[in-house]
């Protein structure tokens, strides 16, 4: 246990719409049932950019963003029994307390134990562990991985194989796990099935990987950026199509291509019009469409009820349906045994001082995932 305040570098988002700023921050020691982690590597995700843009209704400033990280436990607070200094870990934005009604229900991974305070950018006791220039800095998604040291609740930490390369497995903290789980947990893709994936960014590629692992026989990638097609095929897409190449709605194109529609579709963008197209591209009688992308606040989805009456199912998923603390170590093991890909998602690697470039690469569509080494 450490009672010392640590001074370190962090990328602070002082206000919406402005680049993050590398600052010296003070990180208080962990309180009861908290863990202080030295972050070794973190990736930059669209969700971080969404909050930084000011569009996130839960977004508050100043804040230390980041939720796709990995590191080493530096110290633990009182009452922490399952973790110790030196453990290799991934911080989790969806915790797993193991006690709430959500954790006790096998149908969901949405632990609610600390949801209220986490949504306000605070630790479970309602306070922050970060200060900078005399000001309180908020936490983000219970993780705040854009800091050399962070403090998280002990129920928001997965202990992983110490041999795992942290600049790769940090991606299992969000995007790769989300897409992979959408296919294998939420949709439960069956061998021999036909799948369509809308949006071929990091999450969409992870869905393709999940469909491939599950044994799908035909995997169709859909994106308006044809530069993404080659990578999608590397991950297992059998073909890719660009909606802009057709004069008719993309759902009609897919229905014609697949003799009535796909068995499973996945929307990995966060666009409500595409969510509708993904549902309507599903086969009558049994097609399942999974919403993976996060739409902007206030958006609503629409379709004709007849689409559902005639046997299509609309589902949603968060973090791929994985119960986090117990599942992430298993996903790391699957990666270490080469059952799933992770390295192939990393297109760029930058130093901490270059973190704003990671956002620029993402906005320009030039990266899948950029890993920042701290």
Curated annotation (Swiss-Prot):
The modification N-acetylserine is found at residue 2. It catalyses: a primary alcohol + NAD(+) = an aldehyde + NADH + H(+); a secondary alcohol + NAD(+) = a ketone + NADH + H(+); S-(hydroxymethyl)glutathione + NADP(+) = S-formylglutathione + NADPH + H(+); S-(hydroxymethyl)glutathione + NAD(+) = S-formylglutathione + NADH + H(+). GO terms for cellular component: cytosol. The modification Phosphoserine is found at residues 247, 324, 351. Binds 2 Zn(2+) ions per subunit. It is found in: Cytoplasm. It is an enzyme of class 1 (oxidoreductase). It comes from the Eukaryota. NCBIfam families: adh_III_F_hyde (TIGR02818). The record marks 115 as: Important for FDH activity and activation by fatty acids. Its EC number is 1.1.1.1, 1.1.1.-, 1.1.1.284. The modification N6-succinyllysine is found at residues 233, 315. This is Alcohol dehydrogenase class-3. Its cofactor is Zn(2+). Pfam families: ADH_N (PF08240), ADH_zinc_N (PF00107). Zn(2+) 2 binds at residues 97, 100, 103, 111. Homodimer. One of its GO terms (molecular function) is S-nitrosoglutathione reductase (NADH) activity.
